[in-house]
Amino acid sequence: ILLLVFMVSAIFFMKNLLMVIFTKLLQTIKSKILLSLLFVISAAFLSAFLDALTVTAVLITVTIGFYQIFEKSYKSNEINKSEFEHGKSFLADIMMHGAVGTALGGVCTIVGEPQNLLIADKAGWEFMEFFYRMAPVTMPVLVSGLICCVLIERFKVFNYGFELSD
C-alpha cells in the first residue's frame, strides 16, 4: 500500500513535466506509426525496470491531461465535434499501444510483472539470469509486438490509425 501511495504522489507531482515532454513529442513527431512505435518501445523499456502497473498509471495520467485539453478546446469552440472525436480516438490508440508496451516489456525482466518474481524465486534466478533464460521466449514476443503495432497502425486494423489534425 505504501508503494501505491508513493507512486500516486510521484505521478501527481510529475504530471506537468510529463505533459511538457509528451507535448513536445506530439509536436515533433508527425508520423503516427513512428509515434505509436515510440510509445510501445518507451513503455516496454520502462516496464522492464519498473512495475508495468506504474508505467500504465503514468500513461493514464498523461492521456487524461491531453483529453482535458481536447475537451476544453471543444467546449470553447476551438475545435469541432469531428476533431474532438478524432482526438479522443487518437488518445485511445496511443494509450493502448502504451499498455501493450508495458506488457511486452514487463515479461522480459524479473521486476516487470509480479508473477516474474514468483517464477524467479522458485527457480532461484537473479535479475540477469531471469532475463537470459526467458529471452528465447520474451525477445521474439517483444519483436512480434512491435511489428504488430506497426501493422495495426499502417493498415488501420480495428479502427486504429487516427491522425491528429493540425
What are these regions (language model features)?
Residues 1-81:
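Membrane-embedded alpha-helical segments and adjacent helix-loop junctions characteristic
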Residues 19, 23-31, 111-125:
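Long, highly hydrophobic alpha-helical transmembrane signal-anchor segments
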Residues 20, 72-98, 107-111, 128-166:
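Juxtamembrane and boundary regions of transmembrane helices in multi-pass small-molecule transporters
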Residues 42-52, 99-111:
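Transmembrane alpha-helix interface/packing and boundary motifs in multi-pass membrane proteins
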Residues 54-68, 108-123:
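Re-entrant/interfacial helical elements at transmembrane boundaries that shape
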